[in-house]
Amino acid sequence: MRLTHPFITRSHDLNGLFKNVKTLSQFMKRLEKQSKMFPERYPVEKYLGDGWEFFCEALIKSHPCDNRIGISEYVPVTKNDNGVDGYGVNIFGEVCAVQPKYRSNTKGLLTSTTDKLDSFITEALLEKNIQPSKQYRHFVFTTAKGLHHYTDHEKYRGKVKCFGYDEIRSLVDNNLHFWNFIRGEVLQFEEKVLSLKGNKK
């Protein structure tokens, strides 16, 4: 298995989340529906965020040689989340930070303060001792439209590449290779669980 985000073990119905899904909007509808199933056990916002992080891990790992993304060696951060949800290596061979942000409003824009992106770059620089670079090297993946102009150009100074709703749609909508990649990972996980249960009998 290549996907390691804990959501793969915590989701309410991982198979149901991806079965016959072909578009980003279909995935979002199912994720939002599942998020309301057991809110006392798994808070809605937490479920949406974790599900989106899992999706983004799949997106990144299924496009390592595609220079539109070009992130390799990606590892999700599952503890001490202070603004960075994962690290990888970008197309320039540099360590890069990744921040997925799920938003139900696909027309909205992310801002550094409202959407808690203030610590993103700072945390990346400190945690991995990343040196400043002339080219963009960090990534935000969001179901919102994108970054607010001020956040993009003044706060991040063009060093963060944001994949918004429309850009992600162009990568995954009706892309059966991508959706089958995720379903294959889900199937492997389910087979592993069944195997472990069988060994305990």
Spans of features found by a protein language model:
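Interdomain/boundary linker segments immediately adjacent to catalytic/signaling cores
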Residues: 1-55, 192-200
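Surface-exposed polar/charged interaction patches
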Residues: 34-37, 123, 127, 174, ...
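Intrinsic-disorder-associated interaction segments
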Residues: 7, 17-24, 110, 161, ...
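Acidic beta-strand-to-loop metal/phosphate-binding motif
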Residues: 131-147
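Hydrophobic/aromatic beta-strand patches that form the interior of the parallel beta-sheet core
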Residues: 98, 139-141, 161-163
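Catalytic centers of nucleases
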Residues: 46-132, 148-152
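Charged, structured surface patches that assemble and position nucleic-acid processing machinery
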Residues: 151-193
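Short glycine-/polar-rich loops that comprise or flank the Walker A/P-loop
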Residues: 94, 133-137, 157-158
